[in-house]
């Protein structure tokens, strides 16, 4: 089918719902995810969640595991399979039937016996997997784990948009557990040489309106932040770049800016997330340019998100989950 990606990839997804399997493929595929296998196992009369988790743990083509589960057949066997899988690879799980209403729906959907939420959460946490609360959040976290790049800490450099957007972005990032660190002195000195008229106004997040709408300066500052060891992560609100399209040669400038974003993660070796949702401009020319850019970023393997809040929360959880996995691996190695 044309709506499915044709290339294989490194994400394995097991789902107790065929419709959820379809949505993860289409939503994830549009954001650059590619799959080793997607398995919809329904009422688990033959193969169940423990069998499939064990398979994905041992599958050389699968590097990240995602799961939608409504109920488990054998709690002890499921926990052992989940612990095995999470020790080897990142595992993201969405539980169906977390509430009384959900448990009733799960019973009629797949005859699953949905477990009590507190017991489930404790088991998932102890096994080392990452629990999410919606299908969109599952896709967000798999995008982070698969495409964002290495997360070595929580210090983030941000291209935050303009004015109030920058202020709101700083708040959202802080609330997500990220450290919006001030510009270090060596970076400020570099800005003094590059932007002598505005350097002292520039901070983190970078306020694009200070540097002028539709200009490259904000992106150049972001490149400097990505190259600076003071920052572990970079979060880019690419919506501010859409203003380049207002200029006479806007499509060319905008295309060049998007090309820089495509390569920023590879060049910096850091975790990069780009915010590029639906364009705020509604005329056909600018709408098409922005949507083409979004598709191009996804095709280039860039972790893209629809809004700053979603990206910041995903980045915060990604950093914490990666750190916990590293702690577990170190503890296991020293045992």
Residue ranges and their predicted role:
Residues 1-335:
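Catalytic-core regions of core metabolic enzymes
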């Amino acid at each position: 089918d044309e709506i499915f990606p044709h290339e294989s990839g490194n994400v394995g997804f097991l789902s107790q719902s065929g419709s959820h399997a379809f949505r993860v493929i289409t939503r994830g595929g549009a954001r650059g995810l590619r799959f080793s296998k997607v398995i919809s196992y329904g009422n688990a009369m033959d193969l169940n969640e423990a069998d499939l988790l064990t398979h994905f743990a041992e599958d050389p083509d699968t590097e990240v595991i995602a799961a939608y589960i409504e109920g488990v057949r054998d709690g002890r066997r499921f926990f052992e399979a989940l612990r095995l899988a999470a020790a080897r690879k990142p595992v993201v799980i969405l539980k169906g039937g977390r509430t009384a209403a959900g448990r009733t729906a799960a019973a009629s959907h797949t005859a699953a016996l949905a477990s009590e939420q507190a017991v489930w959460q404790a088991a998932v946490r102890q096994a080392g997997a990452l629990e999410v609360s919606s299908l969109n959040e599952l896709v967000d976290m798999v995008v982070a784990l698969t495409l964002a790049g290495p997360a070595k800490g929580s210090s983030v450099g941000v291209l935050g948009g303009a004015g109030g957007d920058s202020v709101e972005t700083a708040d959202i990032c802080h609330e997500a557990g990220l450290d919006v660190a001030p510009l270090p002195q060596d970076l400020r000195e570099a800005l003094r040489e590059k932007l002598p008229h505005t350097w002292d106004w520039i901070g983190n997040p970078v306020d694009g309106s200070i540097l002028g709408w539709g200009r490259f300066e904000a992106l150049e500052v972001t490149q400097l932040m990505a190259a600076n060891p003071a920052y572990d992560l970079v979060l880019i609100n690419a919506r501010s770049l859409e203003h380049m399209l207002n200029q006479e040669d806007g499509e060319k400038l905008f295309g060049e800016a998007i090309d820089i974003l495509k390569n920023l993660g590879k060049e910096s070796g850091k975790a990069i997330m780009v915010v590029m949702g639906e364009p705020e401009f509604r005329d056909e020319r600018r709408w098409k340019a922005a949507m083409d850019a979004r598709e191009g970023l996804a095709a280039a393997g860039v972790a893209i998100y629809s809004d700053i809040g979603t990206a910041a929360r995903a980045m915060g959880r990604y950093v914490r989950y990666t750190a916990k996995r590293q702690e577990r691996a170190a503890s296991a190695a020293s045992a």
